[in-house]
Amino acid sequence: MSGTDKVRVNVSQTAQTPLHTSAKLPKVGVLLVNLGTPDGTSYGPMRRYLAEFLSDRRVIEWSRLIWYPILYGIVLNTRPRRSGRLYDRIWNHENNESPLRTYTRAQGEKLAKALSDQPNVVVDWAMRYGQPSIESITDRLLQQGCERIVIFPLYPQYSATTTATVNDKFFEALMKKRFMPAIRTVPSYEAEPVYIDALARSVEKHLATLSFKPEVILTSYHGIPKSYSDKGDPYRQQCLETTRLLRERLGLGEDEMRATFQSRFGPEEWLQPYTDETVKELAKNGVKLVAVLNPGFVADCLETVDEIGNEAAEEFLENGGENFSHIPCLNDSEEGMKVIETLVRRELLGWV
């Protein structure tokens, strides 16, 4: 056999050998990230959590010369105790953690099970503020051999204050690494059919358990300062789009489902209408039956369970309302997990 023939045989054999077998596929990490949680409800853990959260320039855009004296001189000396008392009302005392951590862990575990048909996929979860941190979980994914990572900021509607800061922190963690994996980030999904359908099903299921039919359903989103929206943050428009699509899916009129914004902080004007003022106004105007859901939260937390389920309910009932119900977030429900799995599988295309 000539040298040329030998080359031909070798090339032919190589062409028939796949570049990767299933055992040799590079590992792909999937990192779910939510906002964050304190480690406890006492002063120390609350102060550490609030300091990290309120020091984020994406969250508070004021000059540090103005903001830091307020933050460290006033806010962090007064707010930790108040916030701790609020967290204590919703705390998962059995696991000694906030509901957000409980649900996010469950979402990660259920997603890993759903993706078990992809043996090279590693699923994990983290928090933007608090523990487990994005940096620590990114380290863990890299240590497990992940050469590609899909990061999923768990926010259906994009805002620089949420989605962008998750991506910031993730890439900040990678800045310290010699090896940087290939990255994909899941975009906002405010109009995704699977998401709208999941919201609609959750509303329908919850309403079927009530002894009353709400006259008005509010879709309450976490607010942001109006100035952020004026500068180009698309958050408000995406929230309104979600509500419009959900309203159409449920066959409701504009007066039957309205978008509002909650959780304002500080002296600035935030996106309006405000949820707390709206429930009070509805009650004073003779509306007796109200339900509220939080489409922008993928898991129940302080802002949904307490701020809506307790505080908004009290406002409504104290001003003449008769029945108020908070519709739970999608959490780790079958509908909620279908949304997460669908979007993750889309981003995994070509990688698994």
UniProtKB/Swiss-Prot annotation:
Keyword flag Signal: no
Entry-linked PROSITE patterns: FERROCHELATASE (PS00534)
Keywords: Cytoplasm, Heme biosynthesis, Iron, Lyase, Metal-binding, Porphyrin biosynthesis
Compartments reported by the entry: Cytoplasm
Residue sites binding Fe cation per the record: 222, 303
Enzyme class, first EC level, given as a word: lyase
Pfam families per record: Ferrochelatase (PF00762)
Disulfide bonds listed in the record: none
UniProt EC number: 4.98.1.1
Pathway, per record: Porphyrin-containing compound metabolism; protoheme biosynthesis; protoheme from protoporphyrin-IX: step 1/1
GO molecular function, one term: metal ion binding
InterPro entries, per database record: Ferrochelatase (IPR001015), Ferrochelatase_AS (IPR019772), Ferrochelatase_C (IPR033644), Ferrochelatase_N (IPR033659)
Reactions catalysed, as given in the entry: heme b + 2 H(+) = protoporphyrin IX + Fe(2+)
Cellular component aspect of the GO annotation: cytoplasm
GO BP, one annotated term: heme biosynthetic process
Family, similarity comment: Belongs to the ferrochelatase family.
Role: Catalyzes the ferrous insertion into protoporphyrin IX.
Protein's recorded name: Ferrochelatase
Species annotation: Brucella abortus (strain 2308)
